Amino acid sequence: MEQHVIMALTVLIVVPVIFTIFAKKPSLIPTPIQNVFEIYIEFIDNLIKENMGEKGRKYFPLIASIGLFVFFGNLLGIIPGLESPTANLNTTMALALLVFFIYNFEGIRENGIGYFKHFLGPVPAMAPVFVIIELLSHLSRPVTLALRLFANMTGGELISVVLIMLVPFLIPMPVMLIHLIAVFLQTYVFVVLTTVYIAGAITHAEH
């Protein structure tokens, strides 16, 4: 089994266990880890409410889970000798396709056949043109979502390795800090885009 698969499975198994432990036994005096999880939960909750309102709450487990997987998957790349699963195109493409199929499925489930009306555009005479544009736009989403995460994580790991090999005693900490910033940023981008895509799909009938 390839390392990126092992790392992905590790994240899928370990993170839910840790999250469940802290969710079931919250301390009266919050620990630093508990504070971090609470901040994350509040962030996801606010993001969903801003984009989908109260009806978007049912997507909280999905979006929060994707965010946790991406974050901890990215984070593994900081540890020497470990390969981040998100630095492998197979992983990021699988994630992106998951998001793609989910938001389209939810769009159809919420709006029925009306979901496809937005592909026709606002001007009936221009419908053939809008269909092509909308299809290309939607089909490009999983590709750009996957490539963005893959390229940033792969690039970050390669730069870290090269710099650490060149100047092993002076570079590691600054490089790790930069990589950590990239971990947070790419997780944020992936989660926000996932939320926006789902929101756009389920609210088309309202516009």
Curated annotation (Swiss-Prot):
InterPro entries (alphabetical): ATP_syn_F0_a_bact/chloroplast, ATP_synth_F0_asu, ATP_synth_F0_asu_AS, F0_ATP_A_sf
- The protein's superkingdom reads Bacteria
Gene Ontology cellular-component terms for this entry are: plasma membrane; proton-transporting ATP synthase complex
Q: Which residues cross the membrane?
A: 3-23, 62-82, 88-108, 119-139, 158-178, 180-200
Is the keyword Iron in the record? no
Q: Which UniProt keywords apply?
A: ATP synthesis, Cell inner membrane, Cell membrane, CF(0), Hydrogen ion transport, Ion transport, Membrane, Transmembrane, Transmembrane helix, Transport
User: What is its membrane topology?
Assistant: Multi-pass membrane protein
Main localization category: membrane
Which Gene3D superfamilies does its entry note? ATP synthase, F0 complex, subunit A
Where is this gene product found? Cell inner membrane
GO BP annotations listed: proton motive force-driven plasma membrane ATP synthesis
Recorded GO molecular functions are: proton-transporting ATP synthase activity, rotational mechanism
Q: What does this protein do?
A: Key component of the proton channel; it plays a direct role in the translocation of protons across the membrane.
Quaternary structure?
F-type ATPases have 2 components, CF(1) - the catalytic core - and CF(0) - the membrane proton channel. CF(1) has five subunits: alpha(3), beta(3), gamma(1), delta(1), epsilon(1). CF(0) has three main subunits: a(1), b(2) and c(9-12). The alpha and beta chains form an alternating ring which encloses part of the gamma chain. CF(1) is attached to CF(0) by a central stalk formed by the gamma and epsilon chains, while a peripheral stalk is formed by the delta and b chains.
Q: Which family does it belong to?
A: Belongs to the ATPase A chain family.
What is this protein identified as? Answer: ATP synthase subunit a
Organism lineage reads as: Bacteria, Pseudomonadati, Aquificota, Aquificia, Aquificales
